[in-house]
């Protein structure tokens, strides 16, 4: 209980000790916040009464009041409620942990919850802060709560590759790599995806759905990134202007590519014909492109083509969904009823001819796009463009076996695995 203040002498002045109510540190901790406020307000009123009486020692009274208020506020800050049951978590035995990923927790290390509960129990038992700091090696409770706990890191261990994770959900995602689990399958082409969102985006190729519509025109797109790229065409400001024809561009690389069309520099001449091209990949077309005269003929309309792929694509123009022009009788695609083009080898569909033609190089194993720096070939022009960026950057990581360089250590480690497989 609170100790009684000393009895004042009848003739002496009224001092702070005559009015103050004293509490021990343990009693202050157990006080309700309203009781601490009442004690502090009562002490303050008593001191104000003493000051009004004109007694000596007013500076000492104010100093004592300030110290008393600070002590109560500090104790109020150090008071923490118990946020979990005061029961220690039992250690999981090896029999109970069979088949349970949580049993992979490192043995001999207390969990974070148990450490916090131990701290709260110590506070509730009114252990002085000095003893508490000596026990945990810190000075204040704020340092205890804010200090990182090394035992909480990498406590979930993968049984396949011994890799550690700090959260069980990360371990579950990682284990799909070993099992090869891909549970989202397309019902049209049979392609499998790891995530439902990727399957939903892929399904738009078959359904022709384009949910992202431009607010300034009637164009629509399957992906939001395509819409964002399209919106740049509506921007009026085009800071880069061609000095020859006055055409404006939003990006400097686009202007540089356009200016090649006005000059004879960096042009490539075909060995099969007299045509010139601004880009070298155009020279890598199949030889049948330059053969004089059409080589492939369609069976229904007797129309001739230079490449064998186009007669198969021409089937789309003879179905019932095509519309006939009233002037000259030619058939055209009805884009309102247009169905995506399907690859005859893998049943994948594409919205336009150019994408399907580029895709065909994957099945024919043709690699017409060749890198000028390292002479590596690629099936798609986009793959070549992505590869050429690697030559622009520094590659400080060098393979000691073949001498090939890489821009990151991760790529070097992945490359070294090919040498290990070849030796085995």
UniProtKB/Swiss-Prot annotation:
It holds the Pfam family zf-C2H2. GO terms for molecular function: DNA-binding transcription activator activity, RNA polymerase II-specific; RNA polymerase II cis-regulatory region sequence-specific DNA binding; sequence-specific double-stranded DNA binding; zinc ion binding. GO terms for biological process: regulation of transcription by RNA polymerase II. Coiled coil: none annotated. It is found in: Nucleus. InterPro entries: KRAB, KRAB_dom_sf, Znf_C2H2_sf, Znf_C2H2_type. A zinc finger (C2H2-type) spans 156-178, 184-206, 212-234, 240-262, 341-363, 369-391, 397-419. Residues 14-88 form the KRAB domain. It comes from Homo sapiens (Human). One of its GO terms (cellular component) is nucleus. Induction: Imprinted. Promoter methylation of the paternal allele may restrict expression to the maternal allele in leukocytes. There is a cross-link at residue 300 (Glycyl lysine isopeptide (Lys-Gly) (interchain with G-Cter in SUMO2)). May be involved in transcriptional regulation. The keyword Zinc-finger applies. This is Zinc finger protein 597. CDD domains: KRAB_A-box. Keywords: DNA-binding, Isopeptide bond, Metal-binding, Nucleus, Repeat, Transcription, Transcription regulation, Ubl conjugation, Zinc, Zinc-finger.
């Amino acid at each position: 209980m609170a100790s009684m203040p000393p009895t004042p002498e009848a003739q002496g002045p009224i001092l702070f000790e005559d009015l103050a109510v004293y509490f021990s540190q343990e009693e202050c901790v157990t006080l309700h916040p309203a009781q601490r406020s009442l004690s502090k307000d009562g002490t303050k009123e008593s001191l104000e009464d003493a000051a009004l009486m004109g007694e000596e020692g007013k500076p000492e009274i104010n100093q004592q009041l300030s110290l008393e208020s600070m002590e109560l506020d500090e104790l109020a800050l150090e008071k923490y409620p118990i946020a979990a049951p005061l029961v220690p978590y039992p250690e999981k035995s090896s029999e109970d942990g069979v088949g349970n990923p949580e049993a992979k927790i490192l043995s001999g290390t207390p969990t974070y919850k148990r450490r916090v509960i131990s701290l709260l129990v110590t506070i509730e038992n009114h252990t002085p802060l000095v003893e508490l700091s000596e026990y945990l090696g810190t000075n204040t409770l704020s340092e205890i709560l804010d200090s990182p706990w090394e035992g909480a890191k990498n406590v979930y261990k993968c049984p396949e590759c011994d890799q550690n994770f700090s959260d069980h959900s990360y371990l579950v995602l990682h284990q799909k790599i070993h099992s090869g689990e891909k549970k989202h399958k397309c019902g049209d082409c049979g392609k499998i995806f790891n995530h439902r969102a990727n399957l939903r985006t892929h399904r738009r190729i078959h359904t022709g759905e384009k949910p992202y519509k431009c607010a300034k025109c009637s164009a629509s797109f399957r992906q939001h990134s395509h819409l964002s790229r399209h919106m740049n065409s509506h921007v009026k400001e085009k800071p880069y202007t061609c000095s020859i024809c006055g055409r404006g561009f939003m990006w400097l690389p686009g202007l540089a590519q356009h200016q090649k069309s006005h000059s004879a520099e960096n042009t490539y001449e075909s060995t099969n014909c007299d045509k010139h091209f601004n880009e070298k990949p155009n020279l890598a077309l199949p030889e049948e492109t330059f053969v004089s005269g059409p080589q492939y003929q369609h069976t229904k309309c007797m129309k001739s083509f230079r490449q064998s792929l186009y007669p198969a694509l021409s089937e789309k123009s003879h179905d019932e969904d095509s519309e006939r022009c009233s002037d000259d009788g030619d058939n055209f695609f009805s884009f309102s009823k247009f169905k995506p083009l399907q690859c005859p080898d893998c049943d994948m569909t594409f919205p336009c001819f150019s994408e399907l033609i580029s895709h065909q190089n994957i099945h024919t194993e043709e690699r017409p796009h060749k890198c000028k720096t390292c002479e590596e070939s690629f099936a798609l022009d986009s793959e070549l463009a992505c590869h050429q960026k690697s030559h622009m950057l520094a590659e400080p990581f060098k393979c000691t076996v073949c001498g090939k360089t890489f821009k990151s250590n991760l790529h070097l480690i992945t490359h070294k695995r090919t040498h290990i497989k070849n030796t085995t």
